[in-house]
């Protein structure tokens, strides 16, 4: 008689055969990966593996499979063990545990393991139904509906099952919990004979009790409904020389979300346990579509000799193509250096992708082959009665376990090698490992301006189009009605007449600069480029060009043929200079990433646009910026310090705080006005910028290249990994472009000249200083100094005229005024909202006027009258404590702690200390933070900090000494104050007046 052939549980009535299989396109939606695994205890005594080693494999399995939530059973965890695990994996994992009250380390136990990279554990609610056997969590994933999961570990004794399943529902109702979305875990029971080999039916009473619970909860075995005839098992054992297999581990889902589940997997892991992991992905109905994003070459691959050899070989072919083109000079519209370069970058990406796919591993291919063979064996109808077939399946299962263990071991070895080479070194690898990661934010919806107020767009592709259209249309916002070209040009020229002749270099001065974008300039530009920055659409990082340059240098030293990347880039840049950018090359294309700021999350205007450009584009513009270094000091007045070599933001900050003290001491009444430009870099009109460059006598050789770059500039907007169609950049200077800062400085300089030239603005007249103080700038941050006799309307009219011509716009809502001078004057300005008491109308209510004690943030520092020195420091202390707490979890050595303190404590305090000093009590608090971090909060430190401050060769640690560092900063200020050359800063001269005024008469 032929053995029974299982048919499986039939699908629900009316449901298609693959009711649980999600269409392929659904895999492109945002989804959450959920898994279940019986881990068979805390440690693995059979393999002499410690609990921490085992948990490292659990973490590795979650990381590799991008599992957000893993339900685990037979955890054998108590609070002490969870604390130990947290010390090792607390930055990445969070454990929500339920243990039995007695002997938790020896039996039962269920837990949810949360991947902090994907889910914020603070938002998870926990409810215990049965201690150590049934646990519920409830959480929200992004902005979607809440998800409720039940993790179960059923008793081994099936006679206890009816009571167990009934108690779960009773406890759920008693605790007021809604029906779960999923029930997952080790059920120690199968409902269908097909889920066992040999096939047989389990205890009918236990099955009925489980089915009654499922019916009450509205749940079904979704995987079985999707694959009614497939054999797959999660547990294997050998009993009396008989191999038995069963699908004890399952994920039940509610009927409501069954069609939203996909990518079901039952697979072996490297975790030492006798169970396999079952997992699935859930894509909520409202989840946004997720695009492929953009490709980028990982810098870790650049040390692979095989890959770099292939790229270098393709580079040598490019060199030959460029030489051939130079000799042939065929039609440019067919081929030219720029198109050859674009083809090279495209081939480079293909080479890198192919290499990564190939090196993904022979081991992975072996694993897939074993999985395929196992699936074929499980499909054999004789598996229930043929012991040889079952033995073969068991052998392959063990082989799969061995291969998975090797794969995990190899990954650990690779990571260990990376940490050995790069650990406790302040660079990308170490800092990345110890970074406090947060779940990725998804843009759920955007308000559609083409519909009513309640209209929202949820599709990522259409959201990307909405964002694209917004930024394209923004370029035309605020532009006055069109005038004739002649009138427009005349308006610009009239505005530029404010620039004094002394700021316009002569031809002879300009001829001293090399405007050719030479090989030397490109080399310097590459050297100055910072590694680790995000790439443009081509995916090529700076590190690639640097690595190719190093390989060429090595080839030259060994008298071998190499690929001269610097010469190639110089050739491409020269072609752009002479012929302009070829639009087919995509050279000037960029992509924009909107980053949420504040207010309504569905309004695209509340997102900061971050622009990312190709690195070859930025190398060209960095070389162009280097050409402006020499003449820029004549072109731009010393009042502007933004991104200009040898000019410092700290001098501007010190001047503002010194003027506040000076005005009060000398009873010079007035105001300091902090102006804010709205989207400053995005507003400058190009025709105004070109006229400005021409007025400043910038050679056409330079401006021609810049104009070509902007004429061909296009931007794509990325939303949830989806790239929009490009739009042309017709206004503004591009963020992320090394040249943009200097271009903006030149564009705003006519306004600064206009303010300095205005006779109706007294500004502040300081004895002994010929030029009155009226304006300071750091790029777009504009600070005005006005006397009590000035009128704000005068400033407003000047700004309005310049904005009309330049396209800029000042943000009244962010304008802040600090009254200075006598206390009576300061109070009067705040109460009357008038700078000049004779002003007919008060200031706009949107303008903030700072009263005594109110700190105003200016250029990264805090200034004002009678401002507490605690204003910025408490926040910084909190940030340092949190950051050091994250680092502490990596258990760094003393040497590593020294580097961390240098980076965190030094980095967080350096700017503010130099800008406005550090109070003694803050210094003491920071020393306490350092002491606690070094000695892990030990109340009796083994070595005093004063000994750790000593150099390494003097038995010290060379630890950051905050007091000494602060004294060094003070000495630098003293040095600058004592500088008596013509370059002496105005704040130092004002300080002289204050010192003289404070000195006793006759001294």
What do the predicted segments below correspond to?
Residues 1-85:
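N-terminal, active-site-proximal structural segment of metallo-dependent hydrolase catalytic domains
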Residues 57-102, 163-256, 320, 325:
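Metal-dependent phosphoesterases centered on the DNase I-like endonuclease/exonuclease/phosphatase
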Residues 87, 226-243, 721-723, 811-854:
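Short, conserved micro-motifs composed of acidic
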Residues 138-147, 181-182, 205, 243-246, ...:
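Surface polyanion/phosphate-binding segment centered on an Asp-His-Pro turn
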Residues 306-349, 779, 840-920, 968-985:
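Basic, alpha-helical interaction scaffolds
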Residues 402, 417-602, 619, 782:
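Surface-exposed loop/turn segments and immediately adjacent short secondary-structure elements
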Residues 604-636, 654, 678-681, 730-762, ...:
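Conserved pre-motif C helix in the palm subdomain of viral-like polymerases
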Residues 926, 941-1003:
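Extended C-terminal regions of large enzymes
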């Amino acid at each position: 008689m032929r053995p029974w052939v299982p048919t499986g549980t039939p699908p629900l009535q009316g449901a298609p055969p693959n009711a649980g299989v999600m269409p392929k396109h659904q895999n492109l939606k945002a989804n959450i990966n959920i898994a279940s695994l019986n881990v068979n205890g805390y440690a693995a005594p059979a393999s002499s593996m410690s609990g921490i080693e085992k948990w490292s494999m659990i973490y590795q399995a979650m990381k590799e499979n991008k599992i957000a939530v893993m339900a685990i059973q037979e955890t054998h965890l108590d609070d002490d063990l969870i604390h130990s695990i947290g010390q090792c994996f607390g930055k990445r994992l969070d454990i929500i545990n339920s243990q039995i009250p007695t002997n938790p380390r020896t039996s039962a136990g269920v837990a949810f393991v949360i991947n902090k990279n994907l889910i914020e554990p603070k938002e998870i609610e926990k409810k215990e139904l049965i201690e150590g056997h049934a646990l519920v969590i409830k959480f929200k994933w992004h902005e979607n509906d809440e998800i409720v999961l039940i993790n179960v570990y059923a008793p081994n004794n099936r006679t206890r099952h009816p009571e167990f399943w009934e108690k779960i529902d009773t406890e759920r109702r008693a605790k007021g919990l809604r029906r779960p979305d999923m029930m997952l875990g080790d059920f120690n029971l199968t409902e269908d004979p097909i889920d066992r080999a040999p096939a047989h039916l389990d205890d009918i009473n236990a099955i009925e009790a489980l089915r009654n619970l499922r019916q009450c909860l509205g749940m079904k075995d979704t995987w079985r409904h999707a694959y009614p005839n497939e054999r797959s098992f999660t547990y294997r054992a050998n009993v009396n020389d008989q191999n038995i297999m069963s699908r004890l581990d399952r994920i039940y889902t509610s009927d409501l979300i069954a069609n939203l589940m996909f990518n079901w997997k039952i697979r072996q892991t490297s975790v030492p346990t006798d169970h396999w992991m079952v997992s699935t992905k859930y894509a909520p109905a409202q989840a946004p579509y997720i695009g492929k994003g953009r490709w980028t070459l990982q810098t870790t691959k650049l040390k692979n000799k095989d890959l770099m050899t292939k790229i270098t070989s393709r580079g040598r072919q490019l060199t030959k193509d460029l030489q051939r083109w130079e000799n042939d000079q065929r039609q440019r519209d067919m081929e030219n250096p720029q198109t050859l370069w674009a083809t090279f970058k495209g081939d480079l990406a293909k080479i890198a992708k192919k290499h990564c796919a190939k090196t993904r591993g022979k081991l992975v291919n072996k694993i897939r082959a074993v999985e395929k063979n196992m699936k074929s064996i499980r499909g054999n109808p004789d598996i229930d009665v043929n012991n040889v077939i079952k033995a073969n399946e068991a052998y392959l299962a063990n082989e799969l376990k061995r291969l998975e263990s090797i794969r995990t071991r190899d990954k650990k070895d690779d990571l260990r090698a990376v940490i050995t080479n790069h650990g406790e070194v302040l660079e990308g690898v170490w800092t990345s490992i110890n970074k406090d990661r947060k779940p990725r934010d998804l843009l759920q919806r955007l308000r559609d301006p083409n519909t009513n107020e309640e209209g929202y767009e949820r599709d990522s592709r259409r959201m990307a189009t909405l964002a694209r259209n917004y930024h394209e249309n923004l370029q035309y916002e605020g532009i006055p009605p069109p005038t004739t070209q002649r009138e427009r040009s005349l308006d610009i020229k009239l505005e530029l007449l404010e620039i004094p002749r002394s700021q316009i270099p002569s031809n002879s001065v300009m001829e001293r600069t090399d405007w050719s974008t030479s090989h030397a300039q490109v080399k310097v530009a590459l050297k100055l480029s910072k590694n680790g920055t995000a790439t443009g659409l081509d995916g090529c990082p700076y590190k690639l060009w640097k690595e190719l340059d190093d390989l060429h240098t090595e080839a030259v030293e060994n008298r071998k043929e190499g690929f001269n990347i610097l010469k190639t880039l110089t050739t491409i840049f020269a072609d752009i200079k002479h012929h302009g950018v070829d639009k087919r090359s995509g050279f000037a294309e960029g992509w924009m990433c909107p980053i949420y700021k504040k207010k309504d999350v569905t309004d695209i205007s509340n997102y900061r646009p971050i622009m990312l450009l190709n690195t070859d584009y930025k190398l060209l513009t960095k070389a162009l910026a280097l050409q402006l270094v020499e003449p820029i000091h004549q072109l731009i007045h010393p009042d502007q310090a933004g991104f200009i070599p040898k000019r410092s933001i700290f001098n501007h900050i010190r001047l503002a705080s010194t003027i506040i003290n000076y005005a009060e001491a000398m009873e010079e009444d007035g105001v300091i006005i902090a102006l804010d430009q709205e989207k400053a870099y995005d507003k400058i009109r190009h025709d105004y910028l070109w006229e400005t460059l021409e007025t400043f006598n910038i050679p056409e050789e330079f401006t021609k290249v810049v104009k070509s770059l902007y004429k061909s500039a296009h931007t794509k907007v990325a939303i949830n990994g989806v790239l929009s169609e490009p739009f042309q950049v017709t206004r503004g200077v591009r963020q992320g472009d090394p040249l943009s800062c200097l271009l903006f400085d030149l564009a705003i300089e006519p306004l600064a000249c206009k303010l300095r030239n205005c006779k109706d603005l007294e500004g502040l007249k300081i004895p002994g200083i010929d030029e009155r103080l009226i304006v300071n700038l750091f790029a777009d941050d504009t600070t005005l100094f006005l006397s009590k006799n000035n009128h704000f309307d005068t400033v407003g009219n000047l700004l309005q005229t310049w904005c009309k011509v330049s396209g800029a716009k000042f943000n009244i809502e962010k304008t802040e005024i600090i009254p200075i001078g006598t206390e009576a004057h300061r109070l009067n300005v705040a109460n009357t909202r008038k700078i000049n008491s004779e002003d007919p109308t008060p200031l706009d209510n949107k303008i903030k006027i700072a009263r005594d004690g109110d700190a105003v943030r200016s250029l990264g520092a805090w200034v004002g009258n009678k401002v507490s020195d605690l204003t910025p420091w408490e926040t910084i202390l909190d940030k340092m404590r949190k950051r050091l707490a994250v680092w502490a979890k990596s258990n760094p050595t003393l040497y590593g702690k020294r580097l961390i303190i240098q980076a965190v404590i030094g980095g967080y305090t350096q700017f503010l200390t130099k800008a406005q000093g550090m109070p003694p009590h803050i210094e003491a608090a920071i020393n306490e933070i350092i002491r606690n971090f070094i000695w892990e909060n030990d109340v009796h430190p083994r070595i005093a900090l004063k000994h750790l401050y000593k150099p390494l060769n003097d038995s010290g640690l060379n630890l950051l000494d905050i007091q000494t560092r602060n004294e060094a900063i003070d000495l630098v200020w003293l040095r600058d104050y004592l500088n008596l050359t013509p370059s002496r800063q105005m704040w130092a001269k004002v300080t002289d007046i204050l010192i003289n005024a404070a000195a006793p008469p006759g001294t």
